[in-house]
Amino acid sequence: MSKKDNELNHLAIIMDGNGRWAKKRHKPRFVGHREGMDNVERITLAANQLGIKVLTLYAFSTENWARPKEEVAYLMNLPVRFFDKYMPTLMENNVKVNIMGYLDELPEKTYKIVQRAMSETVNNTGLILNFAFNYGSRREITSAVKELGGMIESGSLKSEEITESMISDHLMTGNFGKYRDPDLLIRTSGEQRISNFLLWQLAYSELAFSEKNWPDFDKDDLKEFVDEYKHRNRRFGKVDESDS
């Protein structure tokens, strides 16, 4: 196993536990979401310092619309609060913002702020802070299949020409090139499931789970998980010679 194989270039995090964090402190759920928002800034800077190239954060799923209306309204306003508060810090640290998801379904104010964040950081060359917002992996894969099907129907593509790489290119992470698939997925709050997140891209990703709720997950926790990842034996379906 070469050292290069265990470089952590793309880290994905399911930021879970904001509500539980608030409940433990006898506070409303929105307080947990607010604290979770502030932690995004801290973890982004920590990931940047660790040399991570892409940080993908699961911020709002296509299923989250089923939550109480007041909570959804608060979550839709979080990008506005986040970028208004932290855009100067992101610019100072050369962070490039990307938002993937079905953005045209967002409220107008939310849509405008995420588009502005991407536009203002488009020339930054550091860590890519990639938010999955109004995102669902099954829908993403379905959309990719429809795109490829349309190409076949138009005659610009033959079905036998479709490859796994081509499917990857048509997913929302396709623009990340060689970094499009996460090396490591971390989920906070002790839950151990992937919740319709990056189902195709996580095929050979390493998985890790933290008992801490997202607002409590700090830079030391991140470094501990990154260090542990670097010592894992990533097989990618192959046989480890040391086991034979």
Curated annotation (Swiss-Prot):
Mg(2+) binds at D16, E206. Coiled coil: none annotated. Gene3D superfamilies: Decaprenyl diphosphate synthase-like (3.40.1180.10). Substrate binds at residues 17-21, 29, 33, 61-63, 65, 67, 187, 193-195. GO terms for cellular component: cytosol. Keywords: Magnesium, Metal-binding, Transferase. One of its GO terms (molecular function) is ditrans,polycis-undecaprenyl-diphosphate synthase [(2E,6E)-farnesyl-diphosphate specific] activity. Binds 2 magnesium ions per subunit. It comes from the Bacteria. Its EC number is 2.5.1.-. Its cofactor is Mg(2+). It is an enzyme of class 2 (transferase). One of its GO terms (biological process) is polyprenol biosynthetic process. It holds the Pfam family Prenyltransf. The active site is at D16, N64. Catalyzes the condensation of isopentenyl diphosphate (IPP) with allylic pyrophosphates generating different type of terpenoids. Belongs to the UPP synthase family. Homodimer. This is Isoprenyl transferase. It comes from Lactobacillus acidophilus (strain ATCC 700396 / NCK56 / N2 / NCFM).
